[in-house]
A protein has these predicted regions:
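Short secondary-structure subsegments characteristic of cysteine-rich extracellular domains
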Residues: 1, 86-89
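C-terminal motif of bacterial Sec signal peptides marking the signal peptidase cleavage site
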Residues: 3-6
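N-terminal, intrinsically disordered, polar/charged segments of Gram-positive cell-envelope systems
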Residues: 11-40
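Short beta-strand/loop segment at the start of cytosolic alpha/beta domains
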Residues: 31-59
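Structural signature of tandem-repeat unit edges
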Residues: 42-51, 62-79, 90-103, 113-126, ...
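Consensus positions within tandem repeat domains that build extended binding/scaffold surfaces
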Residues: 83-85, 105-108, 128-131, 151-154, ...
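Alpha-helix boundary recognition
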Residues: 87, 110, 133, 156, ...
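Short, aromatic/basic amphipathic alpha-helical patches
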Residues: 177, 195-210
Length: 216
């Protein structure tokens, strides 16, 4: 049982009204638009054998704080991100990966320092080696059903990562170096009774850090 405690205003407590001017609202809207503006971002990519695109770099004079991977470029579907796309990133705070992406390649987010949130909306099937290695700002990672392969040290050395959600579809966790070297406890959530539960439990049994596998 988990007991939750919250804080709120007491009954009868006076509310404070804050007057917001029209200019303040306009300025806030403009700032939010600038932070999320992808209009000036261009990408370097490769066309794969199936005709879909693999993005490996981006170009932008003004880097948006919220960065969205497009579903398509010039009518071609984006299925992969790779090649240190966000490696050592120090400006972007949030990355949104849309539904078409099925592969996050080698070293894609390695050593990113500014990224605090990664939202994966689709069914990513594989994580390349060191894909999320030493991403210092990430506290939570969630993968949807469909993830099958987790490469060597793909999720490792993330000092602030406390919760990792893996689906029942995980079939291969490459090596025991995954999930290691967290500074505090890492809770790995997996579906109870799934093959993923056994795989992950086996992968972390000799880990040199505090990892808890939670079957739910």
């Amino acid at each position: 049982m988990i007991t939750l405690m919250g804080c709120g205003s007491k009954e009868g407590e006076l509310e404070t009204n804050t007057k917001v001017t029209e200019s303040e609202v306009k300025e806030t809207t403009q700032n939010n638009t600038k932070e999320n503006d992808m209009s000036e971002v261009t990408f370097d990519y490769t066309t794969l054998d199936d005709g879909t695109l693999s993005i490996w770099s981006y170009n932008a004079e003004n880097v948006p704080e919220v960065f969205e991977i497009p579903e398509e470029i010039d009518g071609q579907t984006v299925s992969e991100i790779r090649g240190s796309l966000f490696a050592s990133e120090d400006k972007i705070k949030e990355v949104i990966i849309l539904e078409t992406v099925t592969s996050i390649g080698k070293e894609t987010f390695q050593l990113a320092t500014s990224i605090e949130k990664i939202e994966i909306r689709g069914n990513v099937e594989e994580l390349g080696d060191y894909a999320f290695f030493a991403c210092k700002g990430i506290k939570e990672l969630r993968f949807n059903e469909g993830l099958k392969y987790i490469g060597k040290s793909a999720i490792s050395n993330n000092d602030n990562l406390t919760d990792l959600y893996l689906p029942s579809t995980v079939e291969d966790v490459s090596g025991t170096t995954n999930f290691g070297s967290q500074s505090d406890i890492l809770r790995i959530h997996v579906p109870a009774g799934s093959a993923a539960e056994s795989l992950v439990t086996d992968a972390v049994k000799d880990a040199d850090c505090n990892i808890e596998v939670i079957a739910e």
